[in-house]
Amino acid sequence: MNINAPPKRIGIMGGTFDPLHYGHLVAAEMARHEFALEKVIFIPTGNPPHKVGRRVTSSGDRYEMVKRAVQDNSFFEVSDLEIQRKGYSYTVDTLKDMHKLYPQHELYFITGADAFREIFTWREVQSVLSLSHFIGASRPGFDPHEFLEELKRDYPEFLPHMHLFDVPALAISSTDIRSRVKEGKPIRYLLPESVRLYIEETGLYRI
C-alpha cells in the first residue's frame, strides 16, 4: 500500500430526477473524467424540503428510472440512501452517511449551476462544505463572480473545495419533459430510451 498515493474520489449526484435526463448524465460523465472520479453515485432524493408544495413522483418510480438510465455505464451507480431515510432529505445527512460508507475516499458532490449558487442556504452549510468538494456544472450565462465573492468573504477556508467546469449546453429540463408528456409531445432523445419506455409503460406525468 502506497501511503503517499492520493485518496480515491467518489462523485455524488443528488437530485429529484423527476425524471433523470441526458443533461444529468452528461454532467456526471464529464465531471467523472475531469476530476478523476472512481465512480459517480446517483442518489434520488427521498422527501426533498425544497419541493414542498409541488407534486413529486413516487420515490420508487424515480429510483427505477435512474437505475435504468445508468445500468449501461460501469462507472455509474444508484443508491436508495435518501429514499430509505425518514423525514426530509438534507445534503448534510447524506454526506455524513457517505463518509461512513467510504471513509477512505474524498467526496465530490456534483450539482447544477443554480443549486451551486444556493449552497449558502443549505442546512448546516459549514458542515456541508467541510464534508465534500463541490462541482458546479456551469452553463452559458452563469456568472460565478457574486457567489465566489460571498464564499471568499464568509467561508474562505472552503474555497479550495469549490470547483466549476463547463458542460455542453443541453437545453433539457425535467420540468419541460413532464410538460411535454402531459401535452402528448415527443420526449425521445431528451432522455435514455429505457427511461422513456418506463414513463410510457407506467403512465407517469400524463395527469
From Swiss-Prot:
Q: What Gene Ontology terms describe what this protein does at the molecular function level?
A: ATP binding; nicotinate-nucleotide adenylyltransferase activity
Q: Does the keyword Nucleotidyltransferase apply?
A: yes
What EC number(s) has UniProt assigned to this enzyme? 2.7.7.18
Cytoplasm as a keyword of this entry, yes or no, is no
- GO BP: any one term: NAD biosynthetic process
What domain of life does the UniProt record list for this protein's source? Bacteria
Its pathway, per UniProt, is:
Cofactor biosynthesis; NAD(+) biosynthesis; deamido-NAD(+) from nicotinate D-ribonucleotide: step 1/1
Catalyses which reaction(s)? nicotinate beta-D-ribonucleotide + ATP + H(+) = deamido-NAD(+) + diphosphate
InterPro entries from the UniProt entry: Cyt_trans-like (IPR004821), NadD/NMNAT (IPR005248), Rossmann-like_a/b/a_fold (IPR014729)
**Record key words, sorted:** ATP-binding, NAD, Nucleotide-binding, Nucleotidyltransferase, Pyridine nucleotide biosynthesis, Transferase
The record's section on PANTHER family has: NICOTINATE-NUCLEOTIDE ADENYLYLTRANSFERASE-RELATED, PHOSPHOPANTETHEINE ADENYLYLTRANSFERASE
The entry assigns this protein to a family as follows: Belongs to the NadD family.
- Purpose: Catalyzes the reversible adenylation of nicotinate mononucleotide (NaMN) to nicotinic acid adenine dinucleotide (NaAD).
Query: Under what name is this protein listed?
Result: Probable nicotinate-nucleotide adenylyltransferase
UniProt source species: Desulfitobacterium hafniense (strain DSM 10664 / DCB-2)
